Amino acid sequence: MAENTSTFTGAAADGTALTAVYLTQPAANVAIGLVFAGSDLPRIVHWGRPLAKPDTLLAAYDALKPQRVSGALDDTVWPSILPTQAESWIGEQRVVLRRAGVELFPKFTVTNIETGGVLEATLDAVSGESYTDVAGHARATGPARVPGVIVTARDEEQGVEVEWHLELLPGGLARQKATVTNLFGADAGAQLELGKIELGFPLPESAGEILTTTGHHLRERSPQRQPLTVGRFEKPQLAGRPDFDASLLLTAGVPGFGFEHGDAYSVHVGWSGNSVLSAERLPYTTGVIGGGELLFGGEVTLAGPGEGQNSYDTPWLFGSYGDGLNEIAARFHSYVRSLHPRLFSHGRPVILNTWEARVLRPQLRYAEGTRRQGRRLRRGTIRGG
């Protein structure tokens, strides 16, 4: 069993076999828990502070499972980590697959559960090297084991396999991704066209407000807030890269959450191309925030085994929980710094970047004054006036 990872087994009130997996980063004061019911895809039932008794995740399944609603489907909507129509999901499609132009509606059955995750080696250091950061903490450059779970699920009839990864990183950042594989060869059917895979994190009932950013040149990252109502809100980016309107984070939290207060949950798609961030709530269940890569028709087509590229990896979807936006941001900063140990292993001068905010006469005394303060001047800071 991986460190800071626990597994529990039990049964639901209706006798369904349950398996719970609990991931925690005590130093970061965060934990995440999920429950498997039978061979169904898991559901995230906890994301927040560490639990005093992690085995209560089993009881959370019955506590959170929606009751059957009169006049509705036999199973009330309760999204798994990858909701499909097979589990009564009636929101926006999050899994879009086709063969020969015909839509597939897979029902995934879990075939394997493996605990453990791996944080890849850092970008600017040799594997196995260690260092001490500016706070005096000992760090390793990886790869390193982290709390995580890997779930493999299949629809044998449709010829589709999904491998889903969830990891909890040292700074408290959660991340998930999925790999979709075509199991059918050319003799068994057409190639598998992939239209969308959108992952997500569930929200508690208390999360009733959304924060994103919008903007344009000279007014980038302008915050905008709105209630999380029944329906779907999304921020697509189709410029081939994040543009001035891009919302690097989509955050949902208790109404009025700020920088230092209020439980809030953020997601970020780790992708430089077309992508979408979304928040969605149905009448029968709590909200979901998530996102993924935006694909055009025919952009990703998977061949059969041994016939070419037969799998597709989604970008990482990062999730950050915190009491206020500062704690959320700190988890992202911790992760970014861990990727560049040499850059952050010693003190750095302040970077003063006034750019278009100030025009100075080209006098050396300005540069000399900033040099004495340890600042680094960005090119273009001192301009003729």
Would you name each region that the model predicts?
Residues A2-Y22, G287-G306:
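Short acidic, Pro/Gly- and aromatic-enriched capping/linker segments at domain boundaries
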Residues V30, W316, S320-P349, E356:
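Terminal connector regions
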Residues L343-G385:
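Aromatic-lined carbohydrate-binding/catalytic grooves of carbohydrate-active enzymes
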Residues A27, E103-V110, E120-A121, L302-G322:
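Short Pro-Gly-centered flexible turn/kink motifs
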Residues N4-A11, L18-V21, V30-I32, L41-T285:
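Polysaccharide-binding surfaces and accessory modules of carbohydrate-active proteins
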Residues A27, A31, A178, Q309, ...:
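Conserved, mostly hydrophobic/aromatic
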Residues G297-A303, N310-P315, V336-S338, L343, ...:
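Glycine-enriched loop-and-adjacent helix/strand subsegments that border the catalytic/binding cleft
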Residues A11, L325, V359-Q363:
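Acidic-and-aromatic substrate-binding clefts and catalytic sites of carbohydrate-active enzymes
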